[in-house]
């Protein structure tokens, strides 16, 4: 994934120093796009190890509509624990907005599947996670926001849109805030997996994943890790096999996915900014 390394290098060389909500500070650019042909391999970063179970379980959790971390923790995925209440609640985050937007019974995922099957040329096949009604206040903690009925965190990956051409399904992800080192490789993998799943449900081939970022940043405490990653040579991409076609987009299980030939460099540890 040379495209991703070029992205890191561009931020490192062109980013401006900015303060941020977490107090860590960033090197930041505004506006960047990467394109990945899903026919040429699954875009899983190889210059460090990506924890595949976290990618898969989080996506299945989103699709379930759940906003409690119990399912994740039961599967040894703890990427959301920092922001949850003692009861494991995160408020109306991604899953809630995807499956029941604003609590109004609007199942955006079911709607896009239906549109792809019946009107694939529509320009309205998109899903919003950004809901201004529940954006949390920066003046109080994530947990306090949840108590007030807001989400613990605002969605970083705010919108995605599907597009069909030549019987191929492409997805464009719009990410308002992009943690280039920790978050973006994970997001690319997650939405690539989702595109494969939706394509299978709609009897389509996969096309491209287009990743578009707004505020793209490297945290100041990730510079050393970025330099380490940039020193590594990318390896061949793995391939994804979906072992069965489930009855619906909501019925897939972790065991349905197999990532073949995922060869990678060692993991690079970095602290997440809370």
Swiss-Prot record:
It is found in: Cytoplasm. Its EC number is 2.1.1.45. The keyword Ligase does not apply. DUMP binds at residues 21, 123-124, 176-179, 187, 217-219. One of its GO terms (cellular component) is cytosol. Pfam families: Thymidylat_synt. (6R)-5,10-methylene-5,6,7,8-tetrahydrofolate binds at residues 51, 179, 273. The keyword Cytoplasm applies. InterPro entries: Thymidate_synth/dCMP_Mease (IPR045097), Thymidate_synth/dCMP_Mease_dom (IPR023451), Thymidate_synth/dCMP_Mease_sf (IPR036926), Thymidylate_synthase (IPR000398). The active site is at 156 (nucleophile). GO terms for biological process: dTMP biosynthetic process; dTTP biosynthetic process; methylation. It catalyses: dUMP + (6R)-5,10-methylene-5,6,7,8-tetrahydrofolate = 7,8-dihydrofolate + dTMP. Pathway: Pyrimidine metabolism; dTTP biosynthesis. GO terms for molecular function: thymidylate synthase activity. Keywords: Cytoplasm, Methyltransferase, Nucleotide biosynthesis, Transferase. It comes from the Bacteria. HAMAP family: Thymidy_synth_bact. Catalyzes the reductive methylation of 2'-deoxyuridine-5'-monophosphate (dUMP) to 2'-deoxythymidine-5'-monophosphate (dTMP) while utilizing 5,10-methylenetetrahydrofolate (mTHF) as the methyl donor and reductant in the reaction, yielding dihydrofolate (DHF) as a by-product. This enzymatic reaction provides an intracellular de novo source of dTMP, an essential precursor for DNA biosynthesis. Homodimer. Belongs to the thymidylate synthase family. Bacterial-type ThyA subfamily. This is Thymidylate synthase. It comes from Francisella tularensis subsp. holarctica (strain LVS).
């Amino acid at each position: 994934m040379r495209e991703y390394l070029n992205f890191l290098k561009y931020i490192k060389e062109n980013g401006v120093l900015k303060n941020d909500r977490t107090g860590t500070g960033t090197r930041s650019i505004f506006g960047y796009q990467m394109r990945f042909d899903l026919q040429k391999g699954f875009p899983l970063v190889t210059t460090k190890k990506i924890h595949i179970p976290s990618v898969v379980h989080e996506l299945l959790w989103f699709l379930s509509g759940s906003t409690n971390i119990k399912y994740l923790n039961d599967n040894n995925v703890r990427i959301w624990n920092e922001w949850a209440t003692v009861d494991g609640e995160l408020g109306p985050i991604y899953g809630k907005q995807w499956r029941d937007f604003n609590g109004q019974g609007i199942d955006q995922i079911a709607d896009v599947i239906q549109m792809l099957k019946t009107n694939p040329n529509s320009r309205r096949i998109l899903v919003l996670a950004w809901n201004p009604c529940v954006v949390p206040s920066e003046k109080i903690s994530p947990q306090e926001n949840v108590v007030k009925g807001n989400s613990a965190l605002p969605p970083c990956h705010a919108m995605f849109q599907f597009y069909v051409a030549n019987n191929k399904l492409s997805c464009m992800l719009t990410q308002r805030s992009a943690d280039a080192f920790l978050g973006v490789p994970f997001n690319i993998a997650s939405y690539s997996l989702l595109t494969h799943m939706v394509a299978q449900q709609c009897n389509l081939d996969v096309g491209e994943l287009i990743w578009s970022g707004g505020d793209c940043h490297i945290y100041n405490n990730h510079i050393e890790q970025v330099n380490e990653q940039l020193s590594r040579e990318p390896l061949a991409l793995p391939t994804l096999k979906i072992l069965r076609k489930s009855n619906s987009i909501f019925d897939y299980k972790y065991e349905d996915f197999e990532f073949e030939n995922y060869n990678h460099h060692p993991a690079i540890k970095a602290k997440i900014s809370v």
